[in-house]
Amino acid sequence: MYWPRKKGNFKFVDKESIPLLEIKNTGDIEREFYVYSENFISAANLLVNHVLETNENTKKDFWLFGLTYLYRQSLELILKSIAFKYITIKNDRVEFIGRVRHNLKYAYDEISLLVPADDLSLKEREREWLKTFLTNISECDEQSDMFRYPFSIKMKAFFQKQTHINLRVLGTNMNTAYKLLTMISNKADEIDHKDLIKFKPEFLMSSGSYLEQAVIWKGFNNNNYYPYIQGYMESGKYLYELIKDDQKVYLFLPMCYMYRNGIELALKRILVEDCQFDNQTAANKMKNKKHSIEGLWNVIKNYIIISSDVPDDSSTINDVELYIKQLHNLDITSDKFRYPINKFLKFHFDKKVRFDVTNVSLCFYELFTFLDAVDSMLSHQNEILAEMELEARRELESDYERY
């Protein structure tokens, strides 16, 4: 059974463990962004292929969120890699990141002005398809939040109605866009143009076989974190199994981001769904803490202690807090596992760091198991309180009617 240990440590390395992994950025920003993009699209392809081969509809529905994010992130990374090929001055690079942020259309528009015409190996039809596709993604998901969280910072659900998404079309179009961008980057001149474009340049298409579709159910819209959390945590664990069994170590950072976002979502679920804050208060607290793991924990910690009636001699809260602080210090702003640099262009792994992949995966899952158990406990308590309040209201109404 997974459960936080007294001395759990994300950075612990068992020298006998397999696989062990060393990470160090090369110092070449353009190259690092390109390598990260390859790793992310590879992870997305492995996930989408797995869910298309399975008969488990819940996997299709839940894993959709993480794999779509991985695809989108791969495009953002390769777009920025191309831009940094032509933007070489540090301050200009910082300003570029600030201008485009996560907007794929903005990044592509700037690249279109930067890349000399002689370097563009795309045909006119391919350029038009790519621009339309990236624009469509940006119109749906401008700042890369739509498949990471169930609702915006203003508590508005991203999906207002039941939505069907064809996973095969999604994967095919994402790979088409990635290949076209790779050609612009001059990293893969050998790509054959013939039949490269298979479908219309739409981000989310619902046509095709039902067996190829993921469904975002209407019930997901009501501030429901569950499908997102399950999807991210299960996707992370699947990537871990591929690393362990097939030595696919390039999946490590995508795995870590799947887990990390799953933990952030689990903390926010407790804050929003269990702590009995009104929507505005919950929204303000999330806005203040942003992606801070420790900040979110500090908001809910006392509520958990009061509600759980933990024995005085229990060390669980202290054990969990150790995990929280370690993860927070490892990735304070939720960018270490998805970008090679921070917003000031400092490399995250400018010095060699060694990871025990099995231990890292274990620590993430031990922390998640605790947070998931807390949600179950608080949800049950809130249901009982709601029933008691309803019964008390009925008694008052009955007494009033007698008079």
Task: Enumerate the language-model features and the residues they cover.
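Domain-scale activation on soluble regions of proteins
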Residues: 1-403
